């Protein structure tokens, strides 16, 4: 039976202050549990995912942010598992689902080529990014990203899960990926 350590979970409205606090509270745990190399990779992927939540958080007509975004990090025997969640409109879901499906369909070499293509051929979006975040998360995680969209309140809540191997020699993607 695989053991699991629940490290942190947060659900609500995210902003840079909350993101900074999450990162501060988890950084020490990561360094205590694993090598600096593994901790650095997990920390980087936490930053990227939390930035995605904050930047792409839905705001209602009054400008108030959606109050149900989600971040969870667990440490299992073979891998860290990070889950992000956010509410998206039907229009955003369609584009996001296509983008995620394209990313998941690529192997390591194709992901690197896709990353370079985006880097060389795209400008910045209205949110300040170039569309590299999800591709980079896929490149730096172990195995495929997994995602799911659940209908809720006229839109969709989407979950994104990724795993980071603690020891690549002992990592079994099938064992580590049974999350969502």
PLM features per residue range, with description:
Residues 25-47, 120-127:
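Conserved short strand/loop->alpha-helix "switch" segment adjacent to the catalytic nucleotide/phosphoryl-transfer site
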Residues 6-20:
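STAS-typified acidic loop motif
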Residues 48-52:
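Conserved polar catalytic motif of the HATPase_c/GHKL fold
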Residues 17, 44, 129-133:
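Charged, alpha-helix-enriched surfaces in structured cytosolic catalytic cores
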Residues 37-43, 54-61:
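Short N-terminal amphipathic alpha-helices
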Residues 8, 28, 179-180:
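Conserved small-residue-rich
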Residues 1-4, 20, 27-28, 32, ...:
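A generic structural signal for ordered alpha-helices
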Residues 1-8, 55-175:
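Conserved beta-strand-loop-beta-strand hairpin that lines the nucleotide-binding pocket
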């Amino acid at each position: 039976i695989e053991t699991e350590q629940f490290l942190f979970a947060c659900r609500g409205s995210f902003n840079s202050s909350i993101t900074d606090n999450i990162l501060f509270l988890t950084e020490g745990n990561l360094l205590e549990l694993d090598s600096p190399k593994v901790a650095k990779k997990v920390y980087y992927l936490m930053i990227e995912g939390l930035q995605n939540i904050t930047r792409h958080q839905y705001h209602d007509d009054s400008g108030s942010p959606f109050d149900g975004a989600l971040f969870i990090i667990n440490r299992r025997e073979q891998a860290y598992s990070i889950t992000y969640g956010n509410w998206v409109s039907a229009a955003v879901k369609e584009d996001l689902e296509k983008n995620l499906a394209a990313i998941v369909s690529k192997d390591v070499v194709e992901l690197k080529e896709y990353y370079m293509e985006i880097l060389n051929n795209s400008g910045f979006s209205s949110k300040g990014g170039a569309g590299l975040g999800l591709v980079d998360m896929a490149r730096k995680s172990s195995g495929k990203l997994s995602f799911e969209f659940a209908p809720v309140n006229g839109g969709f809540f989407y979950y994104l899960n990724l795993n980071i191997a603690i020891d690549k020699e002992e990592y079994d993607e099938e064992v580590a990926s049974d999350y969502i």
